[in-house]
Amino acid sequence: MSRFRIADTRVKILLVRLRQIGDVVFTTPTFAALRDHFPSAQLTYLVEPAAASVVAGNADLSAVIVAPRAPGVRGFVADLALGRRLARERFDLVLDFHGGPRAALLTWLSRAPCRVGYEVSGRAWMYTQRVARPRELRPRHSVENQWDLLTAIGVPPPDRGRYPVVMPLVRDTATQVRQRLASHGVAHDARIVVMHVSAGNPFRRWPLEAFASVAAALPAVDARVRVIVTSGPSEADAAAQVIRDARERLAPEVREQVLACGEFSLAELRALVDDAALYIGGDSGPMHVAATTRVPMVSLYGPTLPARSEPWRAGSLPALAVEVHGLACRPCDQRVCEPGDFRCLGQISPGRVIDAATQLLLRNG
């Protein structure tokens, strides 16, 4: 495969990853690496609205283009117009981390002389350079899979200590989150445990009653613990159920140590975790947002493997993975089990998560 070479480092580069919060987070280590390789480059990121806050305000990016997705003919016409806009930008290089039909089309419409993407049947012709599509179940980290596109243009291999995942902290948002916590009675010296109880993918949802068991156990570890239960924007009922069930197991005087503080946007969740003592959650977008902080983490893995999606950050930062070993079906394509009958997650006991959380709380207390 020929490698992209350019003598003038003032190259214009477009990075494409349209959606899936975790996958957008997984592209963020490439920003600093590209900046090191092309010191004067202009880096532009193309993303759909749901994940745009992950990359907003990143100092290594020159611009972010937010591309709403519309259905049917209207969406196709809008994409043609967006393609013309991209062509006018005269990008030298496009890296399509996404690889889906829409991303490939927009990459091709950019008319960049070098367009790097995955070897996918029916779309490979849209790229001038192609790399092998990573095998979905291969136990290799997603950051490394996406880095294959950088390898194709001569960028050195990834180093998670030097190039961790990044999501900028918005200072005003952090102030607003602290004010919200105070309004719910959370003291400034509280040891906040953020427990995210939902996942966009139903195959990655640990049972709510298990989360409730963990939430009810943690106040006994440290009287300063306050468990903030969070969920996706359409799953507030799940958070409410966990809080209700946990409080039923607690003595009246400590029931308020498990609570919700309203809904959190991605930027607000990033700020909330930044002030936390611990994050607990499954393999989901919010977990990877949490990984952009230095906060200790307990991550739960069912159909996926830590080797593929563990927090991509310096090894010195505390993070424990809880998973079940010995299941021949792991990892899987997350299409076979019936919802509610996930033996991989179902075999993770609350006790194991409580032990992991206690270990990190005591270690960093």
Task: Enumerate the language-model features and the residues they cover.
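Catalytic machinery of carbohydrate-active enzymes
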Residues: 1-365
